[in-house]
């Protein structure tokens, strides 16, 4: 029981330390919406899909990001799996590209594992990304070629039931998570630490395979200039849909 609490405490300390105010920290308010689907169609194979929309500022003003991600999953065990896939991200017009969107192509690989205890559950993943972001010529025109860097992400999520029937359908649980992002590559100069995403909220378990998570998320990000930071205060709503199709085939 001590191990997951110790890991979560470590990431909470990282979150709080990273979020200390600086002279050049910009604060924005956003809404993050997401849908996740994991479908298992055999003992060893499955597929991954998630899609996201994020607003830009003042919670409902303009769009910032649209993202779609797909992957093929290989199950090492029921609670441990490897996934590799591709993501496409569209960054809507922003400060350095006011009249055009910036596309990004992002291959990714991931190790994910779940641990169940009598009164809590944890989920962790280690994700490796290769980011190809289209270069920008001006506010109105994309340039040829892409900026490239690698990014490593580690996510730790802790779920605690809020009823005697732990994680049963039509019950709630409390959810706390922290995800740390690290950049590396030739084009990364100042922001090796990319960002930390800290989330605290609730999950409503609709049934054995669906749950709705909602709550507050803070994203503390170091920008490429190195001396500028962004603190995003977000309302986050994610829907998780997990399907086991093996029984349907029998």
Please describe what each predicted stretch is.
Residues 41-44, 79, 116-122, 162-172, ...:
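Short loop/turn motifs that connect adjacent beta-strands in outer-membrane beta-barrel proteins
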Residues 47-49, 82-84, 120-126, 152, ...:
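Transmembrane beta-strands of outer-membrane beta-barrel proteins
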Residues 27-31, 64-66, 103-107, 146-154, ...:
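Residues that define the transmembrane beta-barrel architecture of outer-membrane proteins
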Residues 21-85, 89-92:
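Start-of-domain marker
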Residues 35-39, 70-74, 109-115, 128, ...:
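Residues on the lipid-exposed face of transmembrane beta-strands in outer-membrane beta-barrel proteins
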Residues 126-211, 219-220:
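Outer-membrane beta-barrel transmembrane domain signature
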Residues 111, 231-250:
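Outer-membrane beta-barrel "beta-signal"
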Residues 51-57, 86-92, 115-117, 128-132, ...:
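Transmembrane beta-strands of outer-membrane beta-barrel pores
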């Amino acid at each position: 029981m001590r191990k997951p609490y110790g890991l979560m405490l470590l990431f909470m300390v990282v979150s709080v330390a990273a979020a200390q105010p600086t002279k050049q920290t910009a604060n924005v308010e956003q809404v993050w919406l997401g849908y996740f689907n994991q479908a298992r169609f055999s003992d060893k194979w499955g597929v991954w899909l998630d899609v996201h929309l994020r607003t830009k500022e003042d919670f409902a003003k303009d769009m910032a990001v649209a993202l779609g991600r797909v992957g093929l999953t290989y199950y090492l065990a029921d609670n441990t799996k490897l996934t590799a896939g591709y993501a496409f991200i569209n960054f809507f017009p922003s400060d350095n590209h006011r009249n055009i969107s910036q596309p990004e192509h992002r291959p990714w690989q991931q190790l994910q594992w779940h641990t169940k205890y009598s009164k809590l559950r944890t989920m962790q993943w280690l994700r490796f990304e290769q980011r190809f972001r289209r270069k920008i010529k001006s506010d109105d025109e994309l340039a040829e070629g892409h900026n490239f860097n690698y990014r490593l992400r580690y996510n730790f999520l802790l779920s605690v039931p809020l009823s005697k029937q732990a994680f049963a359908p039509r019950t709630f649980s409390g959810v706390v998570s922290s995800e740390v992002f690290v950049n590396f590559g030739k084009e990364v100069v100042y922001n090796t630490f990319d960002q930390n995403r800290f989330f605290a909220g609730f999950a409503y378990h609709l049934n054995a395979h669906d749950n709705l998570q909602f709550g507050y998320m803070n994203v503390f990000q170091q920008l490429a200039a190195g001396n500028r930071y962004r603190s995003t205060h977000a309302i986050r709503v994610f829907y998780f849909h997990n399907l086991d199709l093996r029984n349907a085939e029998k």
